[in-house]
Structure formats: C-alpha cells, structure tokens
Amino acid sequence: MRKIIHVDMDCFFAAVEMRDNPALRDIPIAIGGSRERRGVISTANYPARKFGVRSAMPTGMALKLCPHLTLLPGRFDAYKEASNHIREIFSRYTSRIEPLSLDEAYLDVTDSVHCHGSATLIAQEIRQTIFNELQLTASAGVAPVKFLAKIASDMNKPNGQFVITPAEVPAFLQTLPLAKIPGVGKVSAAKLEAIGLRTCGDVQKCDLVILLKRFGKFGRILWERSQGIDERDVNSERLRKSVGVERTMAEDIHHWSECEAIIERLYPELERRLAKVKPDLLIARQGVKLKFDDFQQTTQEHVWPRLNKADLIATARKTWDERRGGRGVRLVGLHVTLLDPQMERQLVLGL
C-alpha cells in the first residue's frame, strides 16, 4: 500500500508578504491587480477571507466586500525563492516529488525510512521544518492514493493535517460529496445530484456500464474514485505543458454575447492558475476551445508571449463565427501552452 502526502501552503503569496512585513499580519490583504486595470485577486489572507474575498475574484468586487483591503501587486521573485526552499525540504525525505504549482506538491514516501517510515510523522516533520526555516505554515493530507491525499490536505486548514489510513478509506468515501473529488465541477455536481448521485456511496451502488453510457470517460473516473481507486503515480518527471480552464453549460448557448460573458468569467481563473505555476505569466501560445451540441469540438490558438484577455476574446469570436455553423455551444474553454524550459532559457539569454 502506498503512502502519499499532499502538501499545500496556506495562502502562500499573502503569507510571504505577512512574513516579510509583520504590520500586514492582522489586517485584510490580497495579492492582485488594481481595480482601475480590471485586475483579479490571486490570493487573500484569512482576515480578508472573512469578508468574502476569494481567489479569482475581480479586484473591484473584493474592494466592495472589504473597502479597507490592502492590495499588493505581488513579488514573484520572493514567492519563487520560498517555493524552491520548500521543494528542497521535500527532497530531504523523498526523491519522488510531483510539484503542482509554487505552493503545493505530492510526495510519495512509501519507501522512506525517515520517522520510522510513518507518513503521518513525516508530514508533521515537513510542516514543522517549513515553519522553522521559512516562518510559513503548510497543511498536509496523508492517504494511500493521490486524490484522497489532496482532499485530506484541505480538511484541517490552515496549519493542520488530516490522515486517511487504508482501513478508513471505505467509511470516508461513503459520505464524501462528489463535489469534493478533484475534477468534479459545480455543473457536473449539479447534474449528478439531479439523478440522485451526491456522494461516493451513491455512486458505489451504480452499475459501471450505466455510468459509462451516460458520462463516458468521466463516468469511469467517477466510479473509480468512488471506490477509492487512483492508480496515478507521483510523477517526479512531470513537466507541466499547459494550463487551462473550461466550463460546461447547463444549457447550450446560441449567442456570441453569452460566450463572451463566459470568457469574462473564466479568464480570472485562468490568470490565477497560470500565476501559480508561472508567476511571470510568460507563455508560448494561448487559445480557445468550443464544444458544440453534437459533441464535436474545435480549438484555435496562436503564438502570444503573455496572457491577454482581449486577444483571447478576439480568437474566440473568430472561432465562433467561422466554425460554429449554427450549432449550439455546450462548452467554452481557455488555455495556454507553456514555454519549453530550453526555449525559455534561450529567450532569457537573448534579452
């Protein structure tokens, strides 16, 4: 049985700012773009979250909820430096590390001899070491598979951890809401609940064939996760090549204005996700995806050095006009392709 730890730093960007400027610790702060430039919030500290300020929220809305919010532009070199230090701490316990972004990672400690091989004690020691050396707090989840470790890391935030032992997995899954499973969004969760599927326990009673017929590949993943099955390895060689965000509508859309409104809502989340893995926002390409009511889909992208909403909207409009052919649209997606590390190095050297 594997021993997987998911470590997630607590409001990472904001935590670095509060560490470096103690005057910020007890006041609401957020990292993000200005209201005048229609910026969005990247992250907020817990005092700000009490007012409802959240990641990916437009800055203007955040300031309405919390007029005395202190807005900071972000110091991405400082965040990257802290992230590198955290990753070095991970490497003291295992070489099997899969970074997901600057502030979270999976660790496979199945074969680790530290702490007598106890994943629970390793997670505690890692969190304590991070605090001792960086004065930052982390939360952790421990489980025999990746998706449960990720869910567990959110159970006792901030500055806590939650352990799901192999023996506890069946009982934990019985009441686990499907919406908690990574990859099950609000629209999917609503559709599942509409047919009586709210928890993993509900899905366990379903025939896999029926789920496959109704939901395709997603149905299989849903069934496997509800049984506690997740065979994905912690991939130390993982190189993230793209970042994306998409939305499946409850009803098909037929007017460009509806599509544009969805892009306006998706863009802040794309910006937030990209900032977590690429703080300088440098990219190779950006593009859009449309899926039609006949389940055919099309993508269009082109070279662009930085994330740019106006260009994405223009690309989407061109795709809408040229490829829709009168069909309804059931899904809208935005994505960016990241720079190859070798190409990025060449670009930096050429500056």
Swiss-Prot record:
InterPro entries referenced in this protein's UniProt entry, alphabetically: DNA/RNA_pol_sf, DNA_pol_Y-fam_lit_finger_sf, DNA_pol_Y-fam_little_finger, DNA_polymerase-Y, DNApol_IV, IMS_HHH_1, Rev_trsase/Diguanyl_cyclase, UmuC
Domain UmuC: 4-185
Intrachain disulfide bonds: none
Record-listed E.C. numbers: 2.7.7.7
Chief localisation class: cytoplasm
Residues binding Mg(2+): 8, 103
Full protein name: DNA polymerase IV
Annotated source species: Shigella dysenteriae serotype 1 (strain Sd197)
Lineage: Bacteria, Pseudomonadati, Pseudomonadota, Gammaproteobacteria, Enterobacterales
Originating gene: dinB
